Regions:
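PP2C/PPM-type serine/threonine phosphatase catalytic domain
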Residues: 1-250
Length: 250
């Protein structure tokens, strides 16, 4: 939370060993840079101005002599964000994120991810039969199905800021940015969340309960919720998750 903005920022899982910060993974570093920017950003920014300025912030984190990020999207700092501008009464959805406004769900899914997740769900039972050590006690020890789809996940990143929007230090694909304009003359109950919640609900309690039910019934994410990764051994959920709920007065 900042004076003028409320946001949930989700750094993308690194798909490369290359790091741009000595102590932080790329996704966390991107999240930190965006968060710091929002704390001092002018209240009056439009979504276009925000996208331009936050892109500059990330781009400046790349070494001047490093051309890899331009050539290879998997080498980039990358994050998704759902941002509420308190002055403009708008919600900006950039990348894979979700929100609820007065009980109505809005999503901004990556277009290429659903078919890749579907492929993983088809492969998982076969590979589990081939590798008995793949799972233990309802947790994935090694996800051979994810290994199989990883080349497609990396290839899909070629669409980054070409066919879908993310914050990665290069011009944001504005047709992929979703803007929700809130009515100025009435209050709103708002939930902003990362994609770590498979089923977003109007409250944290209900969202957590839905997550627990998914973990109990489909921990590998191959049936009721198909995803590109499941519950790994040693983890308590499928992915990092963040949620903030607030009431915006008129």
């Amino acid at each position: 939370m900042a004076d003028n903005y409320i946001a949930v920022i989700d750094g993308s899982t690194s798909k490369t060993p290359k790091h741009y910060h000595p102590t932080m993974r790329n996704g966390r570093y991107a999240m930190t840079l965006i968060s710091d920017f929002l704390r001092q950003a002018p209240a009056s920014l439009s979504v276009t101005e925000f996208c331009y300025r936050v892109t500059q912030v990330i781009h400046q984190a790349y070494p001047l002599d490093d051309s890899q990020p331009r050539r290879s999207p998997e080498q980039r700092l990358c994050a998704s964000a759902v941002v509420c501008s308190l002055l403009r009464k708008e919600i900006w959805m950039i990348g894979d994120c979700q929100c609820m406004v007065d009980g109505h769900l809005y999503t901004n899914d990556k277009p290429s991810e659903a078919p890749i997740a579907e492929e993983r769900s088809r492969l998982f039972p076969t590979l589990q039969a081939e590798h008995p050590d793949m799972v233990r006690d309802g947790r994935i020890v090694h996800d051979y199905a994810r290994d199989a789809i990883l080349p497609k996940l990396i290839a899909s990143m070629q669409g980054e800021n070409r066919t879908y929007a993310v914050i990665d230090g290069f011009d944001i694909f504005m047709p992929g940015v979703k803007v929700i304009t809130l009515r100025q003359d009435e209050p709103h109950d708002i939930v902003l969340a990362s994609d770590g919640y498979p089923f977003l609900r109007p409250t944290l309690k209900d969202s957590e309960n839905a997550l627990r039910e998914q973990i109990a019934n489909d921990p590998y994410n191959i049936h009721t919720f198909k995803a590109t990764k499941g519950l790994m051994q040693g983890n308590v959920s499928f992915d990092d998750r963040a949620l903030i709920r607030f009431r915006l007065s008129k």
